[in-house]
């Protein structure tokens, strides 16, 4: 395996571990999710370039679109929860249920 692939897999793993450890605050969870999406974007981009798949060249762009949508929805949810409750704890999201 090339060092770039190892680094991207390590970055994804560190972001996943960070998501599991720092899950109490919503902002840190969103940052870890963004780190995971960025490492997946770089990983799919390098795989598409090294494998020379013509059908796989659109995959990084699609992944980037989903990452932007996820970031927008996550930030709007963070603003809504922090304006309503004054906190960004993930435990307060259970209060949003009917």
Swiss-Prot record:
Its main location: mitochondrion. GO terms for cellular component: mitochondrial inner membrane; respiratory chain complex I. Pfam families: Oxidored_q2 (PF00420). The keyword Cytoplasm does not apply. It catalyses: a ubiquinone + NADH + 5 H(+)(in) = a ubiquinol + NAD(+) + 4 H(+)(out). It is a multi-pass membrane protein. The chain crosses the membrane at residues 1-21, 30-50, 61-81. Its EC number is 7.1.1.2. GO terms for biological process: ATP synthesis coupled electron transport. Keywords: Electron transport, Membrane, Mitochondrion, Mitochondrion inner membrane, NAD, Respiratory chain, Translocase, Transmembrane, Transmembrane helix, Transport, Ubiquinone. The keyword Transport applies. GO terms for molecular function: NADH dehydrogenase (ubiquinone) activity. It comes from the Eukaryota. It is found in: Mitochondrion inner membrane. Core subunit of the mitochondrial membrane respiratory chain NADH dehydrogenase (Complex I) which catalyzes electron transfer from NADH through the respiratory chain, using ubiquinone as an electron acceptor. Part of the enzyme membrane arm which is embedded in the lipid bilayer and involved in proton translocation. Core subunit of respiratory chain NADH dehydrogenase (Complex I) which is composed of 45 different subunits. Belongs to the complex I subunit 4L family. This is NADH-ubiquinone oxidoreductase chain 4L. The gene is MT-ND4L.
